[in-house]
Amino acid sequence: MGKWFTKGRIALLVIFGVLIADQLIKVAVKTNMYWHQSENVFKWLYDKLGIDATPPTWFYIYFTENNGMAFGLEIIDKLFLTTFRIVAVCAIGWFLYKFVKKGMKTGFIVCISMILAGALGNIIDCVFYGVLFNESTYSQIATFLPEGGGYAPWLYGRVVDMFYFPIIDTHWPEWMPFVAGERFIF
């Protein structure tokens, strides 16, 4: 590595690069799609490029918003959850700093930097999106800085989720209790 591309600078480039891309994609999805609207990325790309073929079906932009923790769970108060996220990002940042100072492998630093950037992006969603956007619904696309104000106060916004990879698309076995024969997508 050259003098300019130190591990610390690489970490910062990854964090800011991922964070900027994350927020640009989230704002584009939020201001151009209805809630739970889904678009096959390859179909869209094939249409734009004029490719006459059946596109793969394993990568979608599926607009949803997450009220709570992973999988949309809402076990604890939203304010506590947002505060916890901020504390967790500070801890990840501190560990990243220590890893850089210890001279850990660049690949490891990049991975931790991407995790940190994703967590920061979710904090931005929680802190600002409730104030900056109105409600996204099945019949209304959100607008930036609506006249009547946003859908939630500071720290109470929802995390925008949009990447969907239905890699496994099958049916449960007939012998499986409660879900026998039902479709299973993961």
What are these model-derived regions, one by one?
Residues M1-F186:
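Alpha-helical transmembrane bundles and membrane-interface segments of multipass inner-membrane proteins
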